[in-house]
């Protein structure tokens, strides 16, 4: 049975009639996502992976070490009899491919630049009031899927409580260039400053960095004037396994916390994604 969908998005999107019309170039400041093997399988089943993999890199090996310790753990996809442990993809490309596909679907209406102002429901229907600039929208549906983030307006509008745990850390996220190729190896390095993750990216010398640090200290690592300081800290913590850390992109910081909704479904509304369960 065909189901008509209205997709409400808070941000304003560009119009991509065809993903191939405008050339895409990898950005050194691009943010990235690590996709699990199951997520990749879902995109394959949807017929989207052939486009997505153009700017994705498989993780074929994972090395885990601790600063000051000789021991290490090494996992290889080949030995585990899997194609890979997952894929790392640039968020900008992931969003572009998915948006292009959404705009091709006749049963999906994308309404962007929207702010939901009210969500109510009765036994038969859910009702949404929203604003889009000066325009006021009133919508109703038999099912609402709310995926509006860790601070979900929809969750609060429904009176659903949530337990929260603050880890007192922020994650520094960026892209770096190293003198040695990554060879599709992901690394996790435990140090006194926190666990450092290095993931392979398209381009054999580019890696994604995720480095949790104590909340309040992130200013030391952000800003263009701190580029060399950040690279030096990476070098000191990680050693020469990746060669020399030569270049860093813009650093982003994200607070680390857990938010778990007390309920994930109420009446005709389902919470999904970070609105239901945020881990880090």
Give the residues covered by each predicted segment:
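Glycine-rich FAD cofactor-binding loop and adjacent beta-loop-alpha segment at the N-terminus
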Residues: 1-60
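Glycine-rich, N-terminal phosphate-binding loop of Rossmann-like dinucleotide-binding domains
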Residues: 15, 148-149, 279
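Short beta-strand to alpha-helix junction loop
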Residues: 34-37, 79-100, 218-226, 256-260
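Conserved N-terminal helical subregion
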Residues: 52-157, 165-170
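Short gly/ser/thr-rich secondary-structure transition/capping motifs
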Residues: 124-127, 250-259
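Central beta-strand plus flanking loop segment that forms part of the substrate or channel wall
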Residues: 151-186, 205, 215-217, 235-238
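Conserved FAD/dinucleotide-binding core of flavoprotein oxidoreductases
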Residues: 191-255
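Conserved mid-domain beta->alpha element of the FAD-binding
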Residues: 254-280
């Amino acid at each position: 049975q065909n189901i008509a969908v209205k997709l409400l998005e808070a941000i304003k999107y560009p119009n991509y009639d065809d993903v191939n019309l405008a050339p895409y170039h990898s950005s050194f400041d691009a943010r990235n996502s690590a996709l699990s093997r199951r997520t990749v399988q879902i995109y394959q089943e949807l017929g989207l992976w052939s486009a997505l993999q153009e700017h994705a890199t498989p993780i074929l090996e994972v090395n885990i070490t601790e600063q000051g310790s000789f021991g290490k753990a090494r996992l290889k996809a080949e030995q585990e009899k899997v194609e890979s442990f997952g894929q790392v993809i640039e968020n900008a490309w992931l969003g572009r491919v998915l948006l292009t596909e959404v705009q091709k679907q006749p049963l999906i209406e994308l309404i962007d630049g929207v702010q939901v102002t009210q969500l109510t429901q009765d036994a038969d229907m859910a009702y949404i009031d929203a604003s889009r600039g000066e325009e006021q929208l009133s919508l109703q549906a038999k099912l609402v899927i709310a995926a509006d983030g860790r601070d979900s307006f929809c969750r609060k509008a429904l009176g659903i409580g949530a337990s929260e745990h603050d880890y007192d850390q922020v994650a520094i996220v960026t892209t770096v260039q190293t003198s040695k190729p990554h060879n599709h190896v992901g690394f996790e390095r435990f140090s006194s400053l926190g666990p450092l993750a290095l993931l392979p990216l398209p381009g054999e010398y580019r890696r994604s960095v995720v480095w949790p640090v104590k909340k309040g200290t992130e200013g030391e690592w952000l800003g263009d004037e701190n580029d060399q300081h950040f690279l030096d800290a990476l070098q000191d913590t990680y050693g020469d396994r990746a060669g020399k850390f030569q270049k860093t992109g813009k650093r982003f910081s994200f607070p680390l916390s857990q938010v778990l909704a007390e309920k994930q479904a109420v009446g005709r509304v389902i919470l999904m994604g970070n609105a239901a369960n945020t881990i880090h």
